[in-house]
Regions:
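Compositionally biased terminal segments of proteins
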Residues: 1-123
Length: 123
């Protein structure tokens, strides 16, 4: 989701971060905390509960290399979008991306000027 997905789907623009939408599930939360610690982002506030509440944004780093982990995005349900995801290779790395219809729907529901501009260019 976010600027990288927008670019993948054909509207090339700058972005200051990588937005990753994560499922709100206990096993997923445990794996995320472990992975983040392995990457060296361990802070006292890091715990599984951060990933078990919808509407959370966990930010790591500073633009332009910031990573944002989102537990919810506007107008979309994770399981439904995950079922319609696109599997792609980016720099020889397999990634799952939100489908174009789901991305446009999300952008319209988010409603910020930047999101509406993305939706207009992607439609």
């Amino acid at each position: 989701v976010g600027g990288y997905a927008v670019c993948y789907h054909g509207y090339f623009r700058t972005t200051g971060d990588l937005d990753l939408w994560v499922a709100v599930e206990p096993d997923n939360a445990r794996k995320l905390v472990q992975l983040i610690r392995e990457f060296g982002f361990d802070v006292p506030e890091l715990n599984e509960s951060l990933f078990l509440q919808k509407g959370r944004i966990i930010r790591m780093g500073e633009p332009p290399t910031r990573i944002e982990l989102l537990t919810e995005i506007s107008g979309c349900e994770f399981a439904e979008c995950h079922a319609r995801r696109i599997e792609a290779m980016l720099d020889d790395i397999p990634v799952s991306l939100i489908s174009l219809p789901d991305l446009v729907h999300n952008k319209l529901k988010a409603g910020r000027l930047k999101d509406l501009d993305d939706a207009r260019h992607l439609s």
